[in-house]
């Protein structure tokens, strides 16, 4: 064994061994308990960042630990390879998205291997290959036949100059990111999958997910947004149709003083024909961003349509306004307004001088003061005719019943969740497998024409999708009739909604999934990824699993038993102000800092001498130039050090502060382990451990070893507090480094201890542990070695620490046998020189003994 720890030599050698031996390749094995450990698959952006490294290190630690428990562990990896960034990069680099993507995959795959992650590479998937997306296309056509897919017009961001649809993130301050033209809202036909058909089950089954974070479950509950209310129909004077609204507060119905409809509502459109102000307002609404978050904060505006609705219970005429806060795609495109008891309605009514009618009493049973704001709390009704005096629940039921009796209302459960729009007007995605015949009939692409392959050899102009620009691509025939293919592509959330299942059978050619393999491995035992995916990806992931279950492919109801959301990685951020007042962000690597005695940064400059402003720690990002390149760190310290720091610096679900001093600390610790193993093995062969022959000190050290095994096992396996597991191993290492190494049993005990330490560290630092295990004469490869088991006998405390007091003051501590009598404890206390001097020449008048804990001698 060489004396110096040289990670650059060890790591490449061990990685080559894993590759050649195919150590982490697995197949279904009914004789073994399975464990499926999955980290969210990366987008091949070009380089790994520290967020990736953290996510994948956590996954690898769990997978290697479970493997050492003797389980059949599947840990796959792949690439979420479609998406918008590839289109931008292709235009910028004058290439096509496909070669750019495949180059990135090759580069990042090498980076993952350099970090020593134990993946089954035989199952690698890239979602942009026809071998993958063909099954997604086929499944979509089956969902269409089941009635779970439909097409309808829906609002998108449209750039009139480029004649193209923009993603929300491509709209900057209401303008096109490319040509700065004012963006419009345009209604175009798009494909939807009926996730709302599964809303109740998606909500209900959250209760089965005991090992998912409550925050994620709450976010999904709110997103699905189940509510119980009443749907009410209003007649409108001079308008052919009725207006339908939904409310969760029918108790306030007698206070409804106006209705509001979306600018795109047929009633508003009709009224605009002879109302120029309304027509202009509708036009303005077309350019409003469609995101819900924007809706909440934007100024509420409206125009009176001139129509009057008839209140179904009072017969009063109430005005119908067109308002920018009502969206056509939400509910019926019309809402009932009760300004006395809803703050948004109140602000709108105050702005436009509309009637505000209170119908709920304040908590003290007085009439509410509505001079400043609405009273939104529930309470007792007044000003409501026959319903006066009823509290919320009774009023809800009485008014709902009355409306139903009159045939103008019905109770209804509503969901905030909307159907999933899967159409994207982009090129780099899987083509949607639908065709349109010349007579307008829409059909799914026949199975013998699947997959609909996306051409990869294209020229990008940065404006139009190549498959939209080429009229020939869309032409096809169905049953001998000419037809046109759909030129939209799937939302990339489609690919990431079922990849976890395809990993169980990536080479399967007979269908989307091989049920036998899928049901052996699924559900996923632990799924690791960022909390930013809480609603979109993790909801679609659950939805797709239920679709596959109902298609007979899987038997479980949910895709993953446990979800672990890792925290973000933060780093110092610095900038200097440029000549034009702009902020120039400087990488923390290039900042020369001065710190105070507490280690806080007080001053910083860069190599060019700019005074830097330190903004504290923030998430590593391109915008703040504070990302640390994992590759540089691996080259400087080795992959094991980077992995150990990542797992030690913070609990897995909390933010991690990147500190190079911490990385250096992790590196020093690995060197200490290496040094101790080197010194130990240099002394030659070791005798067998004879537990019965150990001295009290040796027994105490062995007790520490086995207590550490028990703690680390619990920390990794049950609590998943990986940082405390590492801390416990470090504490044990300090004791081992101080332990005597001369006697035969000293060395035998150290051999047992070091073999345990190396196995416990293996999930975190697998390269160095692979090597040290061999040096310590471990059997076979450490990758196949069992996890150390704590010896219950060794952990039994056969001695205990008793505190000795004289007249109530602590004068010493003594170690005695657990079963020592009071007499023996007194005798032992008298021999303790710190205690003995207080007993000299005095009489012990009383003895208070708490067995195994305290001896108090009262003297006089």
Swiss-Prot record:
Renumbered to this chain, motif 'HIGH' region spans 42-52
Per UniProt, subcellular location reads as: Cytoplasm
Keyword annotations for this protein? Aminoacyl-tRNA synthetase, ATP-binding, Cytoplasm, Ligase, Nucleotide-binding, Protein biosynthesis
Recorded GO MF terms: aminoacyl-tRNA deacylase activity; ATP binding; leucine-tRNA ligase activity
Q: Where is this motif: 'KMSKS' region?
A: 619-623
Which of this chain's residues are annotated to bind ATP?
A: 622
InterPro entries given in the database record: aa-tRNA-synth_I_CS, aa-tRNA-synth_Ia, Leu-tRNA-ligase, Leu_tRNA-synth_edit, M/V/L/I-tRNA-synth_anticd-bd, Methionyl/Leucyl_tRNA_Synth, Rossmann-like_a/b/a_fold, tRNAsynth_Ia_anticodon-bd
GO cellular component term of the entry, any: cytosol
Listed under catalytic activity are: tRNA(Leu) + L-leucine + ATP = L-leucyl-tRNA(Leu) + AMP + diphosphate
Principal EC category: ligase
Extract the PROSITE patterns matched here.
AA_TRNA_LIGASE_I
**Could you say which EC number(s) this protein's record lists?**
6.1.1.4
Q: Transmembrane helix: is it a keyword of this entry?
A: no
Question: In its UniProt record, which GO terms are filed under biological process?
Answer: leucyl-tRNA aminoacylation
Repressor as a keyword of this entry, yes or no, is: no
One Pfam family linked to the record: tRNA-synt_1g
Among NCBIfam families, the record links this protein to: leuS_bact
What protein family does this chain belong to? Belongs to the class-I aminoacyl-tRNA synthetase family.
Protein name (database record): Leucine--tRNA ligase
From what organism does this protein derive? Answer: Salmonella choleraesuis (strain SC-B67)
Q: What is the gene called?
A: leuS
């Amino acid at each position: 064994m060489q004396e110096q720890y040289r990670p650059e030599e060890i790591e490449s050698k061990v990685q080559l061994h894993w590759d050649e031996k195919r150590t982490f390749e697995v197949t279904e094995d009914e004789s073994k308990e399975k464990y499926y450990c999955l980290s969210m698959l990366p987008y091949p952006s070009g380089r790994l960042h520290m967020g990736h490294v953290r996510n994948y290190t956590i996954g690898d630690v769990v997978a290697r630990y479970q493997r050492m428990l003797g389980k059949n562990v599947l840990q796959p990896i792949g690439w979420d390879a479609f998406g918008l960034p590839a289109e931008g990069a292709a235009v910028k680099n004058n290439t096509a998205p496909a070669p750019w993507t495949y180059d990135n995959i090759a580069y990042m795959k090498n980076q993952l291997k350099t970090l020593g992650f134990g993946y089954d590479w035989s199952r690698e998937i890239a979602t942009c290959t026809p071998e993958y997306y063909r099954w997604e296309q086929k499944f979509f056509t089956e969902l269409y036949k089941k009635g779970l897919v439909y097409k309808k017009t829906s609002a998108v961001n449209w750039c009139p100059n480029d004649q193209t649809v923009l993603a929300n993130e491509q709209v900057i301050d209401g303008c096109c990111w490319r040509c700065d033209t004012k963006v419009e809202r345009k209604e175009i036909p798009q494909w939807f999958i009926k996730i709302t058909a599964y809303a109740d089950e998606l909500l209900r089954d959250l209760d089965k997910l005991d090992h998912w974070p409550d925050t994620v479950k709450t976010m999904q509950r709110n997103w699905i947004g189940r509510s119980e209310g009443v749907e009410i129909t209003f007649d409108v004077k001079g308008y052919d149709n009725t207006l339908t609204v939904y409310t969760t507060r029918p108790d306030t119905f007698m206070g409804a003083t106006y209705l509001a409809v979306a600018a795109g509502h047929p009633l508003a459109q009709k009224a605009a024909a002879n109302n120029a102000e309304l027509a202009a307002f509708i036009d303005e609404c077309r350019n409003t961003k469609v995101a819900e978050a924007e809706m909440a904060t934007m100024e509420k505006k409206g125009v009176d349509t001139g129509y009057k609705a008839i209140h179904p219970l009072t017969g009063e005429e109430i005005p119908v306004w067109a308002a920018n806060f009502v969206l056509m795609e939400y509910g019926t495109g019309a809402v009932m307004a009760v300004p006395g008891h809803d703050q948004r309605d109140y602000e709108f009514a105050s702005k436009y001088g509309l009637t505000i009618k209170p119908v709920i009493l304040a908590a003290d049973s007085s009439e509410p003061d509505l001079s400043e704001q609405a009273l939104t709390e529930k309470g007792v009704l007044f000003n409501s005719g026959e319903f006066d005096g009823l509290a919320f629940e009774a009023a809800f039921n009485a008014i709902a019943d009355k409306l139903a009796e009159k045939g103008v209302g019905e109770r209804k459960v509503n969901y905030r969740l909307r159907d999933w729009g899967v159409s994207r007007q982009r090129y780099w995605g899987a083509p949607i497998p639908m065709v349109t015949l010349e007579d307008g009939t829409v059909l799914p692409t026949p199975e013998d024409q699947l997959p609909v392959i996306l051409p990869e050899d294209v020229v990008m102009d940065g404006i139009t999708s190549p498959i939209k620009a080429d009229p020939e691509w869309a032409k096809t025939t169905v049953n001998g009739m000419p037809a046109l293919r759909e030129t939209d592509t799937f939302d990339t959330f489609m690919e990431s909604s079922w990849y976890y299942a395809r990993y169980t059978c990536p080479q399967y050619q007979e269908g989307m999934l091989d049920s036998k393999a899928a049901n052996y491995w699924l559900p996923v035992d632990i799924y690791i990824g960022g909390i930013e995916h809480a609603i979109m990806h993790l909801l679609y992931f659950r939805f797709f699993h239920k679709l596959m279950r109902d298609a007979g492919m899987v038997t479980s109801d949910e895709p993953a038993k446990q979800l672990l959301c890792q925290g973000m990685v933060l780093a110092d951020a610095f900038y200097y102000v440029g000549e034009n007042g702009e902020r120039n962000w400087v990488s923390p690597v290039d900042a020369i800092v001065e710190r105070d005695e507490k280690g806080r940064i007080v001053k910083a400059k860069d190599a060019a001498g700019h005074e830097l402003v330190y903004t504290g720690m923030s998430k590593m990002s391109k915008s703040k130039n504070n990302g640390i390149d994992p590759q540089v760190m691996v080259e400087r310290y080795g992959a094991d050090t980077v992995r150990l720091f990542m797992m030690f610096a913070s609990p897995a679900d909390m933010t991690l502060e990147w500190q190079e001093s911490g990385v250096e600390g992790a590196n020093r610790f690995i060197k200490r382990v290496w040094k101790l193993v080197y010194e130990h093995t240099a002394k030659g062969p070791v005798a067998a451990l004879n537990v019965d022959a150990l001295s009290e000190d040796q027994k105490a050290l062995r007790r520490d070893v086995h207590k550490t095994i028990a703690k680390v096992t619990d920390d990794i396996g049950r609590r998943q507090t990986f940082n405390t597991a590492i801390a416990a191993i470090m504490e044990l290492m300090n004791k081992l480094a101080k332990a005597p190494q001369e006697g035969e049993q000293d060395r035998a005990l150290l051999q047992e201890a070091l073999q345990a330490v190396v196995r416990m560290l293996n999930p975190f630092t697998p390269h160095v542990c692979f090597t040290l295990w061999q040096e310590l004469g471990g059997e076979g490869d450490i990758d196949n070695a069992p996890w150390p088991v704590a010896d219950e006998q060794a952990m039994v405390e056969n001695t205990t620490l008793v505190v000795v007091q004289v007249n109530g003051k602590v004068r010493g501590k003594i170690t005695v046998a657990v079963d020592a009598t009071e007499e023996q404890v007194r005798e032992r206390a008298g021999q303790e020189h710190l205690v003995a001097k207080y007993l000299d020449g005095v009489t012990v008048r009383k003895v208070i003994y708490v067995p195994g804990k305290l001896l108090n001698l009262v003297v006089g």
